[in-house]
Regions:
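Structural detector for short beta-strands of small beta-barrel domains
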Residues: 41-72, 110-111
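Helical hairpin unit composed of two closely spaced alpha helices linked by a short loop
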Residues: 268, 277-323
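Hydrophobic alpha-helical transmembrane segments of multipass membrane transporters and ion channels
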Residues: 165, 185, 217-222, 255, ...
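Hydrophobic alpha-helical transmembrane segments of membrane transport and translocation systems
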Residues: 298, 302-305, 314-377
């Protein structure tokens, strides 16, 4: 009997190892293929083999009065696809040191180029942008490898949930283009995302049900708070300058960002409290409701400050590229705070309130679901 169990267990381990070895081999093949997939593109791709860079002059920005240096690059690149494969071309590229509207290129960069052809001869070439697919594939492969090494099957399920979220996001974009409210689409997709992610990772059980209900309630309250803040303040104190080029209403995008940005933190809080209280009840079903509530509050206190900071940096990270560009081009800190930080702070504060409310809801829902499991006789 023991030998039979041992063989079954050994066979299961062997199958698991074979599965992960096959997965890693597929990822490796994918990386190698992406590094050599230029033949798949219709656009001309070239690899930079040499650069000669020259300083031209300093120029003054008329808007802010700051100076920036201008450089010219004489680039030699070898074409990697199309009928002109293996031809060496020369490209001139001018860029500003601030790199707001221009780009500096480096040796070994792969770029898309447009060619000016006259009588089957290349007269001139112009760089259109980077070829970035290899970086995406390498990062994705690295992410899958690390998440499966650390999380095993749950790590793989987490990655599947990420794919599901990307799919939901594309659905939101598609139906929003058809005229459906962005707020409604974001809210519904957030609820679906929450349900799918938690069920995939934690299975369908009481703690998952508790976390799903708590997350949905937390998201609903967060969305309502966002709507109330916008309508009461009448947009006073909220600067939407960074959204001025958008063709969609600012309100919908702002609230959708809060819903999507707060989803991860709210889910994390909900499953943390639900799992922790579940563990406490399983270890000691004699615990009183008062002690259980106190334990839930203590857990909430431990994670609240961390999650609010995570939420703040989640929102602020979207503005970092613009902040860096503006700093490099001499724009004052006060202007940056007015244009960017105030909006991100509003998002973080609303999200923080949502997190705090989710803690209370999670404790209440978990106790309600596990009430029968408590033995107070």
């Amino acid at each position: 009997m023991n030998n039979g169990c041992y063989l079954v267990k050994k066979n299961k381990i062997t199958k698991t190892k074979f599965f992960y070895a096959t997965l890693y081999l597929i990822l490796l093949i994918g990386i190698v293929f992406t590094l050599n997939n230029s033949f798949l593109y219709k656009k001309t791709i070239a690899k930079i083999i040499a650069i000669d860079e020259t300083y031209i002059k300093d120029t003054e920005d008329g808007n802010y009065g700051c100076k920036t240096a201008i450089y010219e690059q004489n680039i030699k690149a070898i074409i990697k696809n199309t009928q002109y494969k293996d031809r060496v071309i020369t490209i001139k590229n001018t860029y500003h040191k601030g790199e707001v509207y221009t780009q500096r290129y480096h040796k070994n960069d792969e770029v898309f180029v447009s060619l000016n052809i006259t009588k089957d001869d290349i007269k001139k070439a112009h760089i259109e942008g980077y070829k970035r697919d290899k970086y995406i594939v390498i990062l994705t492969s690295l992410f899958i490898i690390i998440i499966t090494i650390i999380g095993k099957s749950k790590g793989l399920l987490s990655f599947i949930s990420v794919i599901a979220n990307i799919f939901l996001f594309n659905i939101v974009i598609y139906f929003n283009a058809k005229g459906i409210s962005l707020i409604l689409l974001s809210f519904v997709s957030a609820l679906l995302s929450c349900t799918i992610c938690l069920t995939l990772v934690s299975g369908f059980n009481k703690k998952t049900i508790s976390a799903i209900i708590s997350s949905c309630c937390g998201l609903t309250i967060t969305m309502l708070i966002s709507l109330i803040v916008i309508h009461i303040s009448n947009y006073n104190g909220l600067r939407f300058d960074q959204m001025e080029l958008l063709t969609r209403p600012y309100e919908g995008i702002f609230i959708s960002e809060i819903i999507m940005g707060g989803l991860g933190a709210i889910m994390d809080i909900a499953i943390t409290i639900s799992s922790s209280l579940n563990e406490i009840i399983e270890k000691n079903n004699q615990i009183t409701l008062k002690e259980l509530i106190t334990s839930g509050k203590n857990i909430g206190r431990d994670v609240t400050s961390t999650m609010i900071n995570v939420l703040f940096f989640t929102y602020i990270c979207g503005a970092i590229p613009n902040l860096v560009l503006y700093f490099k081009n001499g724009i004052s800190i006060s202007s940056l705070i007015n244009e960017f930080i105030s909006l991100e702070m509003a998002r973080a504060l609303i999200g923080g309130i949502g997190i705090c409310i989710t803690i209370i809801i999670s404790i209440f829902i978990t106790i309600l679901l596990y009430k029968r499991s408590l033995n107070h006789e």
